[in-house]
Amino acid sequence: MNIFIGGAWPYANGSLHLGHVAALLPGDVMARYFRAKGENVLYVSGSDCHGTPISIRAKNENVSPQEIAEQYHKEFKYCFEELGFSYDYYSRTDDAYHKEEVQRIIKLLYENEFIYEKEVEQLYCADCNQFLPDRFVEGICPVCKNIARGDQCDVCSTILDPLDLHHRKCKICGSEPEIKNGNQLFFKLSKFQEMLQNHLEDSKKKWRVNALNNTERYLKEGLQDRAISRDLNWGIEIPIKGYEEKRVYVWIDAVLGYYTVSKKWGIERNRDWETFWSKEAIHYFIHGKDNIPFHSLIFPALLNGIGYKKMPDRIISSEYITLEGKKISTSNNWAVWVPDMIERYNVDSIRYFLLANGPEKRDADFSWREFINSNNGELLGAYGNLVNRTFVFVKKYFNNTIPVGKLEEEIERATEKLYDEVGKSIESGNLRLALEQIFQFIRSINKYFDEETPWTTVNTNIDDCSNTIYNCLFSIINIANLLNPFLPSSSAKIKEWMGCKEASWNKLSLSSGIQLGDFNILFERLDKKLAEEELAKLGR
């Protein structure tokens, strides 16, 4: 089976925070899981290096947009690598090949009469002497009455036009813009209404509820044609006569990246990329809820406009992460920055918390106290404790060698069942449930260790003791295998310590007589005082 997994492309206009990672982590879990199952996987993403957020930051810092994009693209790559993201290709939207492909697609859509010219009212700032693209405008959302940008409201996720906003202001100088007429290019999104409606009906059990509800809302309102050109000097030039000075709307540019990077990957690796874009391939898209309409409506319409009938099979769209009960605010430094966190904490501790408490169905909160409790409780107290006390026992009483033992039927059946249950949970995007299923098993094996009292039977019945430890070691190697999609770093350590090189999504066997490698503590205890230190940094 060919499985394509696309992770949303973060704007390269500032450091990643935990909200970004929480939305994107499910993609890595799925990629690792499907590879272990032996499926043919292509997992891609990249940095969104165009658009107004980058232009605004560059203007504020008196540098070029290219410098800003370069700085944060490098930082993103480093952070994703440190966090264990296993992208097959991580690209960028200012890549030359991507630019050529996007321009080719725009031309093709124009030739196919899915793009047309239209005179529209636009906002113009007399003080700045320029037309204002969407993100250069701020105002009040007409739907929920909160402060919003000119392209979308972060609170209610409504896609907006700058003219929709009340009490509009120029983001650059703060003055009130005036309305002027100008020509723009529009994509005939309305032409795809019926096709997208039919696909929504087919996706009722495959997309997350927020994706279904959000997409259904737009379809009920009736799809509106969307402007794809912007009055900017940073971005991909429109390849149509009379519009060469305008740039491609950043969200058209970004979602087409899934397609263009697949082609580039195929060319560079001499691989058949088109198998991942056939109707038979399975597509997963991983992103936050604010990105839903771009993936559920705009991207499939663009693909159909150039002859690809592939539709999104699974949309794994996360709700938001709050921080200490409040909305994340990058401007007020009410955020946990990923570059800082990966320098201070175990990456598997970060991954575990964000996956075990992920915003799958509703907003979730990141609390420093809960993060420390999570590390010290589940990871250290349950998982790490099982591994450490079993390994220490083997070293002390069995010369660091896996003893002879008979696998107990109950443990074997529970393990086989776990692979099936966890696999189903992952494939449906229920990662919180998948992790809980594994940790229930961990707790049951800890209970088994306690009830079998090997510290007593080592002196009274060595065969019973050997059997207990053998079953614990069998459980540990399979737990590590099951947790590999979630916690790849700690799983790799355990497999190395136990001399295991298998990576399939099947029950692993355990051979007696193998010597354990040098091992150490899997997870360190975190001092609760760290929570106070981290809290003191917020909002400063």
Swiss-Prot record:
Keywords annotated in UniProt: Aminoacyl-tRNA synthetase, ATP-binding, Cytoplasm, Ligase, Metal-binding, Nucleotide-binding, Protein biosynthesis, Zinc
Residues noted as binding Zn(2+) in the record, renumbered to the chain: C141, C144, C153, C156
Entry keyword Iron: no
GO cellular component: cytosol
EC number: 6.1.1.10
Chain span(s) of sequence motif 'KMSKS' region: 327-331
Catalytic reaction list: tRNA(Met) + L-methionine + ATP = L-methionyl-tRNA(Met) + AMP + diphosphate
Cofactor annotation: Zn(2+)
Main location: cytoplasm
GO molecular function terms attached to this record: ATP binding; metal ion binding; methionine-tRNA ligase activity
Cofactor note: Binds 1 zinc ion per subunit.
List of residues binding ATP: T330
Highest taxon above the source species: Bacteria
Cellular location(s): Cytoplasm
A Pfam family it matches: tRNA-synt_1g
GO process annotations (BP): methionyl-tRNA aminoacylation
Chain positions of motif 'HIGH' region: 10-20
Known function: Is required not only for elongation of protein synthesis but also for the initiation of all mRNA translation through initiator tRNA(fMet) aminoacylation.
Assembly and oligomerization: Monomer.
Annotated PANTHER family: METHIONINE--TRNA LIGASE (PTHR45765), METHIONINE--TRNA LIGASE, CYTOPLASMIC (PTHR45765:SF1)
Family: Belongs to the class-I aminoacyl-tRNA synthetase family. MetG type 1 subfamily.
Protein name per the record: Methionine--tRNA ligase 1
Gene: metG1
